[in-house]
Amino acid sequence: MEELQGYLEEYRSRQQQFLYPLLFQEYIYVFAYDHGLNSSIFYEPQNSLGYDNKFSSVLVKRLIIRMYQKNYLIYSVNDIYQNIFVGHNNYFYFHFFSQILSEGFAVIVEIPFSLQLISSLEEKEIPKSHNLQSSHSIFPFLEDKLLHLNYLSDILIPYPAHMEILVQMLQSWIQDALSLHLLQFLLHEYYNWNSLIIPNKSIYVFSKDNKRLFCFLYNLYIYEYEFLLVFPCKQSSFLRLISSGVLLERIHFYVKIEHLGVCRIFCQKTLWIFKDPFIHYIRYQGKSILGSRGTHFLMKKWKYHLVHFWQYYFHFWSQPYRIDTKKLSNYSFYFLGYFSSVQMNSSMVRNQMLENSFLMDTLTKKLDTRIPIIPLIRSLSKAQFCTVSGYPISKPIWTDLADCDIINRFGRICRKLSHYHSGSSKKQSLYRMKYILRLSCARTLARKHKSSARSFLQRLSSGLLEEFFTEEEQVISLIFPKRTSFYLYGSYRERIWYLDIIRINDLVNSLLVTT
């Protein structure tokens, strides 16, 4: 218990007490909408986060002037409630001001965490490039480690039961009471207007208007969750700082936990003390995986440990159904857009010893990764590229564009999805997806010119093929120019993992959420 409290005091020693006055500075809102801190390693471009990049210095100055008025926010909310059907102009100003205020608040509360991460990286002399890892880098790790494990726990991280829990977590880091009261006000009002939280969804489902604030709150929550999970392990302390300090929900990390012992938790309940030399932990968004080489009884103790942490630290009711433990040899788990499983491959080897020969059956383990075709088709259907059954259709909203723009858009989507799913063990699902997008492109062009899709396929066959040519096929065609046609007809089965994927395509991300 004393060791855990020491860790908490060490990491929370740099609390900020005077953040609220920064809300009255105009440059804070410039940072929020222009990402003036772009030179640091914490931020992605705005188009990656979904911002519409709308900013008005006049409205920001007007907001700052009005905030100097006593109880301005309370009067504004009451006025909106009284004139909800007639005060459209007042509602617009309140919604716009509250959105700007939430973005500025998110920038301010990120400052202590950003400074802490920079100092930790400088102390450890860690290059910044190591902080941004590709999501595909997880799969070679799985190929190397999962083959030697016995059990796997599929964990769905519960979202906070009440927003006040998030405020209490932030209070342990920031001692500025005014900022905390402002956060409570924003959460309360946005919750009433159903603009901050989407009902019946996990917390990582953000609204478009408050994505930055929700990113911060969600990562703060994950910060505490992962700290309670791996605090006795020295190897995890560096990864903990990275995963929470970056404050953007594209972060995922994996770590091997050696000899992890569970001591005493805040509820003063003593758990079993156990050690496991082979524990692996991986997380993306609200889903995490815990693998072990131990026994099923050991995994049950892990489940007991996590459920009680949730119950006593985050004030949840007992939720054991969120942890599903299976034997790895009989289990297929879904993670990062792939269905993965460990398959046993049998091969017969003939051995010759003097005049005697005999056959030996050799078993080898291999990680099999496949694309979930049904959820992927469902995702394409929601984007209006095909029907629910996978039948390609035209996209009427794009018929006003030029032909080259239509082809480029379809080709870009196809290349991005193929780029991400290039690690599939079997390519049939990938080829079916490319076929849907290619035929949908032809039908969109045919609808624009009031012609048939067949005529456009015949007229633009070479152009469409080149536009839908994936990157890995281009590389293969350069390395093996004489065997290109052999690979393009579906016989190429090698998996390719890319180390430059730091953001998942929107269609793929919707697939991860809906599955």
Curated annotation (Swiss-Prot):
InterPro entries: Domain_X, Maturase_MatK, Maturase_MatK_N. Its main location: plastid. The keyword Plastid applies. GO terms for molecular function: RNA binding. It holds the Pfam family Intron_maturas2. It is found in: Plastid, Chloroplast. One of its GO terms (biological process) is tRNA processing. It comes from the Eukaryota. Keywords: Chloroplast, mRNA processing, Plastid, RNA-binding, tRNA processing. Usually encoded in the trnK tRNA gene intron. Probably assists in splicing its own and other chloroplast group II introns. This is Maturase K. It comes from Alpinia zerumbet.
